[in-house]
Structures are given as C-alpha cells and as structure tokens.
Regions:
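N-terminal, polar/charged subdomain of small-to-medium soluble alpha/beta proteins
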Residues: 1-118
Length: 118
C-alpha cells in the first residue's frame, strides 16, 4: 500500500542544539511528514470521518516538540516518528526535520528517517 498524507514545512519552535546559547532560546524547525495510511474507505465513501486528521497530527507535533528540549534533531525526529506511529496507528512514516540557519553556508541542515510498523 502506498496511500500517504503529506505535511510539508510544518513550523515548530523548540529548544534545540548543543551549544550553550542554543539551550537558552527557542529555534524554529521545519518538518516534512509522509504518513502512510489506508485511505481507501475515505476515498470510496467521500466521508471525512475516515480520513487521517492532518490538523490533529500537526497539533500533536507542535505540542510535543514545543514542550520539549533536545540536543539533537535526530532525537526529535525519532520521537516524532515513534509518537505519531503510536498515536495515529500509521503503517509507516517518514519524518524530515530541518534546522534553518544551523550553518551560514546552507539554507538548512536536517535529518530524514523512515519507520514502519512491524
């Protein structure tokens, strides 16, 4: 199956980084989410009640990351992937976490992970 819900460049402010100054400020992260979900019933019935609620997914991510502190974007990506898989019963997920301005020569740096239900 390859039905996916996509959320691109979700903006979340959180404490992230290993440098002393980074531990004292909130920085914006951008997240891309690729959520594998069985959309057949929603598509065949045209009923929003069978859809993955992407507003709820977005709010879960904003709430979770916004209330946390991380040293590594790798940790943030893993926690988001595991949490969303559990909370929304996803078949698989790909999470990309981008940190704008981390190095002056690049627009952003980031990590991307993919997790699947076993």
């Amino acid at each position: 199956m390859s039905d996916c819900v996509l959320i691109q460049n979700l903006k979340v402010a959180t404490v992230i980084g290993v440098l002393d100054w980074e531990r004292e400020v909130r920085q914006e992260l951008l997240l891309d989410l690729n959520l594998e979900w069985d959309q057949q019933k929603a598509a065949s019935t045209d009923d929003v009640g069978y859809c993955l609620d992407y507003a709820a997914v977005s709010q879960w991510v904003i709430s979770h990351l916004g209330g946390a502190q991380y040293h590594l974007i790798e940790t943030a990506a893993e926690e988001i992937a595991q949490g969303l898989m559990k909370e929304f019963a996803l078949l698989s997920i790909e999470v990309t976490v981008k940190k704008p301005g981390a190095i002056p020569e690049a627009e952003w740096v980031g990590v991307s992970i993919r997790r699947e239900r076993r």
